[in-house]
Amino acid sequence: MNKILVEVSVGELLDKISILEIKQDKIKDVNKLEFIKSEHSILKDQLEKKVQSNSQLEKLFNSLKEINAKLWVIEDDKRQCEKDKDFGEKFIKLSRDVHFLNDDRAKIKLEINNLTGSKIKEIKEYTSY
């Protein structure tokens, strides 16, 4: 299989690494974990080679990972609501929480990109609420 090499923002790279770390904690299937660990190793290696780490970047990474961990739980809870055909107040709250957390996630990724001088920046624009 051919490799596809694509430049990404530092925020996107850290976001992906944080998600892979959460997957390593949550997923139990050994075959899936093998792929997850391999991808994590590749991305972490590139991060260490290309990005100068500091305490502020580590703090932002930890915030990003915390948000992604919350999103993981919320998505599991939403799937349980789907299974139970329960689309009441709990489902609505969970759905709203997703977009609030994703807004926070986008802000942190932009802050990471600004801090690291990333040439690529994920720009978002949403309807105000």
Describe each region flagged by the PLM:
Residues M1-Y129:
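Extended, charge-rich alpha-helical interface modules
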